[in-house]
Amino acid sequence: SIYEMTSKAEDESTDSIKLGLSAGKYYIKVAGQNAYYGGNYVIKTTFKACSTWEHESNDTYDTANTAVSGTTYSGDIRTYSDVDYFKTSLSANGYINVKLTHPVVSGQETTNMFVLSVIRKVDKDQYTEVYTTKIRGGDTSISTPNLGLPKGEYYIKIAGTGNTTGTLLSGTS
């Protein structure tokens, strides 16, 4: 199961989150949870090709999505253990700047919701963090400083914390 949601019988409608998925065949399963309720339902699905939405699984260095400078990418941190990696490179010494935006997480404005890290690949299977910051639910837009870095391969890592409950994020590098 890639995503699960529950809708209560008294809810007139329930919207799911957007999911970034690789091309392929997917199935939607609708199941009742209560033997006493035999209600009808209507389901509306929207499928749209999008090259700037994160593609799961991008939870490791090896499966990181490629990010092109100046392009805004969107994604979703679904759980506290969800991690999204984006890979980019500097062909010469330069700088990396990442801007991340998200809607206010109501009731969690001062709570750390996400961790944003910029990581340098030093050698095969050897990585080092060059910048890390925590993002609160009320921080709707944050930017890293211009990080002066040597040429090489870099990763932008966005991770949930124990307070994360599925939030849309957008970032530009």
Model-derived segments and their meaning:
Residues 1-13, 33-35, 45, 76, ...:
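Surface-exposed beta-strand/loop patches in noncatalytic accessory domains
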Residues 6, 55, 78, 89, ...:
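Residue-level detector of conserved, well-ordered beta-strand and adjacent loop positions
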Residues 17, 22-67, 84-87, 108-110, ...:
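C-terminal edge strands of extracellular/lumenal beta-sandwich accessory domains
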Residues 39, 92-96:
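Short tyrosine-centred short linear motifs in exposed loops/low-complexity segments
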Residues 70:
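Short coil/turn motifs at helix boundaries and re-entrant loops, enriched in small/polar
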Residues 81:
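Surface-exposed ligand/attachment interfaces on beta-rich extracellular proteins
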Residues 96-107:
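Short amphipathic, basic-aromatic surface patches that mediate peripheral association
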